[in-house]
Amino acid sequence: MHLFRVTAITDEVFQAFQRLIPQLTSNVPPPTRADLEALVAFEGSILLAASLVDGSPIIGVATLSLVRAPTGVHGRLEDVIVDESVRGQGVGAALTEDVIRLAREMGANYLALTSNPRREAANRLYQRLGFKRWETNVYRFDL
């Protein structure tokens, strides 16, 4: 498995998101090229991608978002998406473990995530990797 940090939005990266986002959610459209370029330029985010071997098509992605707050650096694991054709083959685990490594290297004191309860395999993966249920309310304010 080849994991890499996305630093430029190539046609391959753009097309991967057009294919992968609908596999995650139907609530939002796939990002535009400008959205993805803003993501990789944003200082607080790291976009990772996975392919089976270097140069082969992208089969998974994950985003690490970091915020610096008075209580320290906090990490969030966002939008882990593995292509349906390769689920269950360790791609999600590899991406998540790499995000954990990067969060540690960046000085984060924790890494949080949310996962839809219907995504049973993903929830089992996160628990197997050591994520614990965080007893708090999560609120969202749509802007």
Residue spans for each PLM region:
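Hydrophobic adenine-recognition pocket in adenosine-nucleotide-binding enzymes
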Residues: 80-82, 115
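Conserved beta-strand-loop-alpha-helix junction that forms the acyl-donor binding cleft
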Residues: 87, 112-122, 140-143
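Conserved acetyl-CoA-binding loop of GNAT-fold acetyltransferases
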Residues: 117, 127-135
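Conserved acetyl-CoA-binding loop-helix of GNAT-fold acetyltransferases
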Residues: 82, 88-101, 124, 128
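Acetyl-CoA-dependent GNAT
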Residues: 3-72, 78, 96-98, 133, ...
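Conserved GNAT acetyl-CoA-binding A-motif
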Residues: 96, 103-115
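Short coil/turn motifs at secondary-structure junctions
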Residues: 67-69, 85, 118
